[in-house]
Amino acid sequence: MGKTLAEKILSEKSGSDARAGDIVIAKTDFTFMHCTTGPLAVRQFQSSGFERLADARKVAVFLDHAAPTPNAEMANDHLFLRSFADKTGCLMHRVGDGICHQLVAESFASPGDVVLGADSHTTTGGALGAFSTGMGSSDIAIACALGKTWLRVP
């Protein structure tokens, strides 16, 4: 029997013969966070002792969910994320650039890619033939640092 699209992509990205139910370590092509999930991901990144991204060109921060910021706490989160982007060199999408999952679909996700986002709409990239899934902030932090993640093949 043939493979599903997810099995094909995750086989390629893990260097294994991935089948549904398998747990694989897969290379990532793009990882992103936004202004409500990003602060937790960045704090996890920092508390894990990471200082550098695996590839800054493959990581993005989007200031899109609380824009303009409704309170001082969110304004401070925006500053915190901008500082992280400045220090690491990751891509930074500012207020007004657009909503993360739409921009990822338009500019960053391609067929055969593994795309991870700290956003429930990350699966939008699947329409382009990418394996695109949402993850929690801790997993996003690790993927940013290592350029890979563990996944159970669907």
Q: What annotation goes with each model-predicted range?
A:
Residues 1-154:
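Fe-S-dependent hydro-lyases/dehydratases of central metabolism
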